[in-house]
């Protein structure tokens, strides 16, 4: 019944709560659901789209339940609030998860092809980015200028804003992750990576992984309490990119990557008490690999 549009007729507080309940369940499924779970069939019905004719308002398939009323952080009544923009970005994130799952099963069309899943997900991501209102964007929101008390007072806005920022950078980090294509090339003979794609994708992964570290620095500085394990997962994703660059021949990049890896791991440890999955990531072979790399570096210097 929750997925029937007729269930949400009316314009009262109870109806709004029903809408938020439905889309909250959808968002949870996009982030944490199994790829073959009960709610994990991501049809276009559930994909929110943007309308350019209405100042960037979110539109849905006529069969889908409407999004809840959301004006958090908006400067105009036609703009979607931060919660509603996050719903669409979560749908893109779920496509990224599916892409990685396909890669792990050797279901991978060369990512540089125009009809590849990589191209489709990247297109959805860029469309979403293009339609996010200016009021929610990093340069306009100026999170870095806000004091601790203001952030606590307006947590209803800043908590989803932070998650959207981490998600915004995690999506291209995963799509362009060096490990994804190194492993893919080893198991798929058709995946001969051209130098142009390899260079561009690895640079994009590093750029957005570095932005995740910047966001971590700001969260720590502003003493923002976070419990959602997605933040820890995003830190782990960024850490693996920095681990790759810990082997760089460029001394400055190598040093910066080691520093950023340590920041990601320290941040990830903060979620161990609330997430067993984050605890497993902290003690994963990749983290142990970094420790061995560090000991080898120290040995070579002595």
What residue ranges belong to the model's regions?
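Acidic, Ser/Thr-rich, low-complexity intrinsically disordered regions in fungal proteins
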Residues: 1-80, 94-116, 123-156, 176-196, ...
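Residues that mark the junctions of alpha-helical repeat units in TPR/alpha-solenoid scaffolds
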Residues: 22, 163-165, 231
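TPR repeat positional signature
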Residues: 26, 85, 167-169, 235, ...
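Well-ordered alpha-helical segments within folded domains of soluble proteins
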Residues: 88-92, 174, 237-243
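C-terminal substrate/ligand-recognition segments
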Residues: 164-174
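Hydrophobic, well-ordered secondary-structure elements that form the walls
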Residues: 173, 212, 239, 268
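Intrinsically disordered, low-complexity transcriptional activation domains
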Residues: 271-274, 278, 301-302
């Amino acid at each position: 019944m929750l997925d029937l549009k007729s269930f949400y007729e009316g314009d009262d507080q109870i109806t709004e709560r029903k809408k938020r309940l439905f889309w909250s369940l959808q968002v949870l499924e996009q982030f944490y659901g199994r790829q073959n779970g009960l709610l994990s069939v991501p049809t276009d019905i559930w994909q929110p789209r943007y309308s350019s004719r209405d100042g960037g308002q979110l539109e849905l398939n006529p069969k889908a339940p409407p999004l809840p009323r959301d004006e958090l952080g908006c400067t105009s009544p036609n703009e979607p609030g931060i919660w509603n923009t996050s719903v669409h970005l979560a749908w893109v994130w779920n496509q990224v998860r599916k892409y990685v799952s396909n890669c792990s099963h050797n279901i991978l069309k060369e990512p540089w092809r125009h009809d590849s899943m990589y191209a489709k997900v990247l297109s959805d991501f860029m469309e979403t980015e293009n339609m996010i209102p200016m009021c929610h964007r990093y340069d306009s929101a100026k999170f870095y200028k806000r004091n601790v008390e203001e952030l606590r007072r307006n947590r209803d806005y800043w908590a989803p804003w932070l998650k959207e920022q981490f998600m915004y950078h995690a999506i291209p980090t995963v799509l362009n992750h060096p490990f994804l294509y190194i492993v893919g090339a080893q198991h798929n003979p058709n995946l001969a990576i051209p130098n142009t794609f390899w260079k561009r994708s690895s640079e994009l992964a590093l750029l957005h992984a570095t932005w995740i570290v910047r966001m971590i620095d700001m969260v720590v500085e502003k003493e923002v309490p976070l419990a959602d394990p997605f933040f820890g997962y995003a830190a782990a994703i960024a850490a693996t990119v920095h681990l790759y660059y810990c082997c760089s021949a460029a001394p400055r990049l190598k040093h910066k990557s080691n520093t950023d890896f340590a920041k990601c791991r320290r941040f990830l440890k903060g979620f161990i008490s609330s997430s067993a999955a984050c605890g497993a990531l902290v003690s994963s072979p990749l983290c142990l690999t970094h420790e061995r790399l560090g000991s080898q570096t120290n040995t070579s210097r002595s």
